[in-house]
Amino acid sequence: MSNSLLSLLNIELPIIQSPMVGVSTPRLAAAVSNAGGLGSIGIGASNVEQARAMLRETAALTDRPFNVNLFCHVPARADAAREAQWLAFLAPLFAEFESPAPAALREIYTSFVEDFAMLEMLLEEKPAVVSFHFGLPPQSSIDALKDAGIVLLACVTNLAEAQQAEHAGVHALVAQGYEAGGHRGVFDPQQDSEMGTFALVRVLTDACQLPVIAAGGIMDGAGIKAVMQLGASAAQLGTAFILCPESSANPAYRDALQGPRAHQTRVTSAISGRPARGMVNRNYIDLETNAPALPDYPIAYDANKALNAAAANKANTDFAVQWAGQGAPLARSMPAAALVNLLAAEMKA
């Protein structure tokens, strides 16, 4: 199988493993790349030296291309009053686990739009592929990465975002449907069109010149074949890889994905401050009922991480972040290379 995107990415199969910060590992990315797909690591939650170490660890495990994903969200606007109100709202939940709420919240991730040290690191390490989530970095950063010979992907959720990415000069579009697990790539969370994968792929392939990578709800070879018949050049799968032994998903996450909760996923902003889809637990109930205004992403996420840590100290996972897409019930447990091989075989069936 060959198409222009596979040639551009220098991969054999139209299978891309989603970056998934907190779940993806260098071992997972390398296994997917070594099997002929495109493995991915997410460095949006890492500082420069952590990110460099992840890149080098992945490169030591594969001589094939892999994708490095960055968060390009609008930097958070601190609002002490709003943050204090949110912590006061969460205080009874912390008390349930005999823990005080944090005194204050932090902006725990630096957006790539203003992280020029991260840009310099990427220009030094030169990964084959870099992808953007939540938006686009400054044009100067895009131009510098392209000049270094790096292939650029942008996650988009509607036509307006796709046209913006196309105009900026990226090489391909990741069309993320509303079915997808994890954070929505939407540039402006207040303007989410909530388009499903199939409709989005058709709209983008009709209106854009760039290759389209379909993402959201795709779990098997039949799904990959379906989106390619709609015009996609490849598919990006995330939830499908969570049960692989190479992922860093913990036992509670793996158990949930193989149980009844996999059948109920929902999008909420209450966990992090930006919309994201996961398996429903108390995050989706207690944090949304009579809640005050949320702090900005990722400041709100700092509160959730503290609450989950307090619960975990009492052996409770009710507030764990367990991202998953609508295809979650179809997740399969096997090594990543075996899954890629199975997906490729299913595509031909």
From Swiss-Prot:
Residues annotated as transmembrane: none
Induction notes from the record: Constitutively expressed.
Pfam families: NMO
InterPro entries the record matches: Aldolase_TIM (IPR013785), NMO (IPR004136)
Gene3D superfamilies reported in the protein's UniProt record: Aldolase class I (3.20.20.70)
Catalysed reaction, written as an equation: 3 propionate 3-nitronate + 3 O2 + H2O = 3 3-oxopropanoate + 2 nitrate + nitrite + H2O2 + 3 H(+)
Annotated keywords: Detoxification, Flavoprotein, FMN, Monooxygenase, Nucleotide-binding, Oxidoreductase
Domain of life assignment: Bacteria
GO BP terms, alphabetized: response to toxic substance
GO MF annotations in UniProt: nitronate monooxygenase activity; nucleotide binding
Cofactor(s) the protein requires to work: FMN
Enzyme Commission numbers on file: 1.13.12.-
Free-text cofactor note: Binds 1 FMN per subunit.
Residues noted as binding FMN in the record, renumbered to the chain: N69, Q176, G181, G217, Q236, L237, G238, T239
PANTHER family to which the protein is assigned, alphabetical: NITRONATE MONOOXYGENASE-RELATED
Family classification: Belongs to the nitronate monooxygenase family. NMO class I subfamily.
Misc remark: At physiological pH, 3-nitropropionate (3-NPA) exists in equilibrium with its conjugate base, propionate-3-nitronate (P3N).
Function: Nitronate monooxygenase that uses molecular oxygen to catalyze the oxidative denitrification of alkyl nitronates. Acts on propionate 3-nitronate (P3N), the presumed physiological substrate. Is likely involved in the degradation of P3N, that allows Pseudomonas sp. JS189 to grow on 3-nitropropionate/P3N as the sole source of nitrogen, carbon, and energy. Also probably functions in the detoxification of P3N, a metabolic poison produced by plants and fungi as a defense mechanism.
Listed name of the protein: Nitronate monooxygenase
Gene this chain is encoded by: pnoA
